[in-house]
Amino acid sequence: MVCRPVFPCRRRFCPRPFLVGLVVAICLFYQTLTLRGSRKLTAAAPGAVPHTSTETQASRCKKGFSQDKQCFLLSGNAQETRKVKESMETHFGSHGRRAILYRPPFYSKTELQLHQHILTQHGYTVVIAEERLNAGLGPGLLEQGDLGSWDLLICLSSKKAEGTPCISKEVMCQLGLHQKANRLPEIQQPLCRKEGLCQIVRRFPELQLPVSPSVCLDQGMQLKPSTSSHLLKTVKPRVWKPGDWSREQLNETTVLAPHETIFRAEDLSVILKAYVLVTSLTPLRAFIHSTGTVWNPPKKKRFTVKLQTFFETFLRASSPQQAFDIMKEAIGKLLLAAEVFSETSTLGPKTFHRCRFCFQLLTFDIGYGSFMYPVVLQVHEHLNFQDYDNMDFEDQNTEEFLLNDTFNFLFPNESSLSIFSEIFQRLYRSDVFKGENYQKELNQCLSLEEINSIMTFIKELGSLGQFQLLFPSTTPGIQSLMHEFYDVANPVGNPGSVLTQYWSLLNVFEQFQFMNKKTQPHPLEWNSFTEDKNIEKPQVPFDAIENKKAAVPQIKNENKEIHCSDDENTPCHIKQIFTHPHLELNPDFHPKIKDYYCEVPFDVVTVTIGVETPKCLCKVHLYEQAGPSFASYPLGLGMNKISIFVVDESPAHGETLITYKLTIYREDRPSLPLFEAFTACGFVQDCGLLIHPEETCGLQPISSDYIEAILQSELKRCPSGDMKGQWIVPCLSCSDNRTCDWREITWQPHNCQYGVLTKPQLQQCLGGRKILFIGDSTNRGIMYYLIERLNETLQEWQKVHGTKFYHNVNGGKTLISYSYYPQFWISPSLRPTFENALEHLLQRSRPLENTGQTVLVVGGVQWLNSNHLQIIHKVLKRENLLNILVIIKTLGIGFHLPVDGVHFLTQSEVQNLWKENLIILDTAKKHGYEVVDTFTITMGRYKEFLQGKCGCHFHEVVKSKLSKEYNFIKMKRSRNHIMGRYFSNQSKLQQGTVTNFRSPYHVRGPINQVCSEILLSRMCANKRTM
């Protein structure tokens, strides 16, 4: 129950002053007793850390924690290791997982629910706390119940800027050793406020911090040297040299000119939001996520992208790894300056206890202008998107996986004690702790504080996931800066100690890399960058370097800067095409060549394409003539055709149109021919898209007894179309799917079989019947398969998006009608309802018998739900057709790819589809309808989709291979899979399903074939004649 504040204090009449004061005092006393949350934190949970009195906490804030005097000699023996582990658990450990979610007055419900879900998955009991406007979590609120009764505090972000932080420095010093919060006030306040950021820049003008001058101009301040920058050894002007950038270029981009240079969004070619997780201060530890959000101010377009793709493709840096390192150095310099600024600030207590496990996920807004050098525009104290009030599906998906990655990184299950002991022994034996970087020899004896710091760092390195190490940094510029800061003025008052901690972490990092070299050669870098050998060489265009085609597209421009001409006489054509992943175009790109072809392997399911033109009034559109200038495409198996429209909008040419065409062939799964000695392997779900995380994924060995059982001739017929089963494929090894013969794959239900009818049996079963289909393109694919099975040919085909009748099926003995639903291209207010569409189809198909001679097939990829089944029953009852055969084709996999033009489902949303699918199956059976469970069949083969933006099509109607139009690619067509040709005892019957290649058209797609055959078996299982 959420405890609400009581407001009995509002004046209804004019009482005496004494009564007013009494009532006010009662209200204030009540507020000190009540925690506004989803439950009260009044009882300490079992095993909680003993309560600490307010006096002790206040004293701690003034004096700080006394340093732990206990010392451990890590000899490597088991007894010493166990002793260290026990001491660590006593000193820092917690016996439970209890989290407080602090909800500010203006919060996001989506963010709240997301944190609840993620923390619950990590085993936390979640308590929601709220407080009055602008109050924050003060000492009194956190102290209620028991300060030791919780382990984790999460301050949710506020949609509106508030003056009071969620938790202050003064409160942080009262936290127990085991407690952590997602706030670091020491750097949050100076970094995430413009006035604080400006003060940092003014404090250290010699550093030429890469911060936009507009930050200080907004505050009415001038960027003049400050007399308080006494931490540096010298005040001589410095030019920082990240990587191999030229001195001239750095001078142009980093020198501050406050009265002349004002960065505005429209002046920047692109703004990148980089997400940085800070896990410690003094020593500073920080990590950067491999994903960022890009905002294109001129085009007002926002999209999420891997940082690797950003630097390779969108920023067009000649050396992407170097550009990334420069950005990391810029962020690292600012973080280090903020840490030192906080320690030497005159605001607040100068000595206070640090929260050893606290962390903060920051968002850095980084602008890139014409010089392609990073400039920090703003730092946000939480995950930030361009428009929080209008977050789209992509934003919500990005927030979800960023938070998932963050908490998986922070709360790994593995212990790091054993690897810590091994690393430490390696360092000590190699005399690393006695090197020149240390001011005195470091004894092998370490305190718990030192052990905890190094162990936490090792644990972080072992659970990086999508994060990469940002700080401590091996960059010479950053290391030089650390010497500048800490050799002269050490914040903790012990010269050299902070620097010693940094060196120890860097040495640990080096040893960790060495130990993991065999399993992960470059654990903290992008493996795909292959230009490292050329970093030390003068920068030249990559298209001028031999044998570098695999690193970046060959067609890239020589210059990093993008220029276009306003001259009307400049020809309008494509200057270059850039793609991710890199595509080898055939022929090589040339502006005058309009058609290109390339091939990609099976695992490449999407491609991002962008185009550059030399003329400013020459506009490029993908997909269609009004499409975007760059976009992500899904790549179905086989041929994918992409059109690139180039329009000259200059007045002299009157919007002339030029079309370029790109054909991308995506290969089938790598497959080996079937050998005599093979292993039967089965799978239900792919490990790349887990629907049931608790169940196995990928290929699993199948026993010979199981194979013998399903090959028995007396195996019973399946009683329904949703029997549980699995895909079975012969392989040399179930641990390597490249050793399988995927041509022989079959869908096999457990303990039963679906009968595959011969052509005469099927013609007899469907003779005299009317079959009505209503649904989307997935239903249409099954309909075309049925027509081809009955006629052995498909004479006509079109992508029907309305209502169509087929009278020439089965020699005219079977009538088939089809209605496309839903008509998503029509405005919702004008779009026909499902009830209207169904009534229209029934009326157009009359006369209809109220028997099994009339078959209604309803299905769609993801729009169908149980409410539609209620509507079907209502309409059939009204039309006196309750006795007809109704077959429900359930949901299917799709919309799982982040591509332009369609919505994108997160993994959790795809998992929710499974639950909805179960509801549809249950509701259909209650109404007496037949079902075909297409979701279970498609989810394990989600990568095997064919053409279409949705990634949901498992069928394709193609012209016959005899067509002259397809002669040049006939050997590249995907194979026509025969359902269960090897494993099933139906093999002889199934030979009759081989395609008649004299047909003008053919429906291909093995998964659609399986679903269609199950549907046909249900049509003919119990032919109703009532």
Swiss-Prot record:
GO CC term, one of those recorded: endoplasmic reticulum
InterPro entries for this protein: Cadherin-like_b_sandwich (IPR025883), NXPE4_C (IPR057106)
Source domain of life: Eukaryota
Membrane spanning stretches: none
Stretch forming the signal peptide: 1-34
Residues of this chain annotated as glycosylated in UniProt: N251, N404, N413, N737, N791, N985
A Pfam family recorded for this sequence: NXPE4_C
Keywords, comma-separated and alphabetical: Glycoprotein, Signal
Coiled-coil portions: none
Similarity annotation: Belongs to the PC-esterase family.
Name of the protein in question: Cadherin-like and PC-esterase domain-containing protein 1
Designated gene of the protein: CPED1
